[in-house]
Amino acid sequence: MSIFSRPIGMALLLMLASSFNTVATEKKAVELLGSSVPVGSKLSYIATEGDIELPVTVINGAAVGPVLLLAAGTHGDEFPSMFALQQLAKEINPAELQGTVLIVHLANLDGFHGRMLALNPKDNKNLNREFPGSKSGTATERLAELLTREFISRADYFIDMHSGSANQKLLNHVYSPFVGNAKLDALTFEFAKASGMQHIIMYGDRPRDPANSISFPNTAMTRGKPGLTTEIGHLGWRDEASIDYALNVARNALYFLGMLPGKVMLNQQAVVYDEVSYVDAEFTGFFTPLVTTGDKVVKGQALGQVTDYFGNLVQTITSPVKGNVLMINETPPIKKGESPVAVGLVN
């Protein structure tokens, strides 16, 4: 039986956590990008380096404990977690906190104001594909380097909080990566379960080279730190239900790590997916979905149709596997090679 297919006992969990324990034995002020945050205090400010600006909150707890990094806005058009982290920053009392919480409220500020799907308008690059970045690179590469150097380096645990863009409808889910380090992979899976999210996707397709980590959370993983990606909310909405959901995920992380008093609300109906199958469009034109998120589909079932600019059917997209629909495009534009549907294979 795989370590990912059974619950881990508390004793083993504590052993796993202790094997990655980098917690300082003495509390000190947090010095971050020009600001000093004393023990038992918090500060929200615009951190700057050169032309890079990052809205951040540093909450330096009164007692020693882990460093939890939470980030939203890696893609500037994914809003619910931005609002959730604003609320979280306001509600945490540093006097009650064990450890330190680092919040990057909006990692891709230029993408946010440029109203772009995933990209940075300064160089048209996807921040979540440019890690660990380069200090002498393009705007996005320099941003990735700064996030790696100043934030990932300080963190013990990390959650990169996303949502579906304006074209995507999705089921809320969390990605639990694995990199071939048994203890790290098991601890990361426990961290994912502690999010309280129902849909947990195992994936190990990211590079394991820290010099070519590509994504924000994989940059943590390749440096020996659990790093999750959450997808909460969709279609570019900022609905209260998704904001509350993301806020509870962040709270669960704090409870799981013992940073705040509280009980982790596990999802008793959690579903673990061994992999996700993406289906590509073979033509450019209009996409019309025939299923929706949460639907159970069988191999060969029609998932959607592609028509040309004149309304002629050119492709029926079918499922290559049996599983659950996790994501589907809800807007018509489709280009050849794009994947408008994702189907999860259930463990």
What is each model feature region?
Residues I3-R6, F20-N347:
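Structured catalytic-domain cores with a bias toward divalent-metal coordination
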Residues G9-S19:
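Bacterial N-terminal signal peptides
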